[in-house]
Amino acid sequence: NGEKVTAQAVNGFVPIERKWRKGDKVELNLPMEVRYSKAIDKVEADRNRICITRGPIVFCAEEVDNAHDVATYFVSDSNMGATTMGAFSSGVMSGIPYIKQGCSALTGDEAATSTLTLVPYYAWNNRGDYAAMNVWFARDKATAIAGRDKVAKLPVKTKNFANKVATAKAGQQRKYHDGQ
């Protein structure tokens, strides 16, 4: 009801004791800091990689928002915490939060200082771009180079490419074929 109350959690709950009246409101301020979660080593493809979360929300990088191929970005320990947050102000993404993350990006085999724009995973591919997306980011240059050079084969099911396979290699255009 417009009054600030400081409360302590007890066994995972925050009790609010008061005499309740019709129309009372409880407004919660739950700060959600950006966190970096390390992949478990059992997942070989994600070794030495992190994902970026805020509260329960996983964020990802889309090609449409970033200057480099999203597979070439890496977030070293020194970049962790170098973030700003905002929200899109127009279009289909209006009101959707984003994170700007300090990082590096590969340009050839060299690393350049860069900024990564991340959107909530639930909101990716909503701009009709069918572009690349990444959730797991390398923690160093060597891991980024190794990941960039791997080829991914993904099944593609669209009206134009039914039962085709998309072969993608970082830095190259996608090629569609019958999987042969």
What does each of the following model-derived ranges do?
Residues 3-5, 9, 18-21, 25-179:
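C-terminal beta-rich recognition modules with glycine/proline-rich loops and embedded aromatic residues
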Residues 12-14:
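Short aromatic-glycine motifs in intrinsically disordered, low-complexity regions
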